[in-house]
Amino acid sequence: MAEVRASRVFQRFARFMSCGLLGWAPALFMYYARTLVPLLEKHPDLHLPFDGSVFTAFTINFGPRTVCYPHRDVKNLAFGWCAITALGDYNWRTGGHFVIWDLKLVIEFPPGTTILIPSAMVCHSNTAIGPEEKRYSFSMYTAGGLFRWVEHDFTPEKVYQETRNRAQAVVEGRERWESGLALFSTLAQLRGGTDKTTDKTEGDNI
């Protein structure tokens, strides 16, 4: 993994994938960036896998014929996005399609293509490729536990929940879900430049 992190190719992938989040969900991007500031101040021994990216973790599927079965990434931030880049050499018209089951979408996914999805929300997979073809994938994401750790003032989840009764927990859960969805952007907001955030200071410092 040290070689991957040192690779200029993967460094560029990581920055591009982070910029994809900024371009399509700028308010969500800023939520990631603002969470990183206190997290890294509290834990200076932690280091992001790639400079210039707000994602804190990555996974590489080395294949050589990577196929993901239908799943949800339930440990990621519930309303967070995962960036996935397809790599390899395969006929993308006949295989390697990206499938979003909840939306009944089957998407052509050529090598070098990046997609961003709320991977904890939607069930997703990809289709098989030919026996002589090769397919790999590079994904970036952030675990939901890191956001809870910061928002609960660096208190373990079990200890934090002991300070709340059931009614409070239900209200907090509903409010968190609603505030998370509010970080998504509509196409009208993106086209009109009327998104909820304009301050990119933290993001510029990642």
Q: Residue ranges of each PLM-predicted region?
A:
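Catalytic core of Fe(II)/2-oxoglutarate
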Residues: F79-G80, D89-I206
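Active-site-proximal segments of catalytic enzyme domains
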Residues: M1-S139
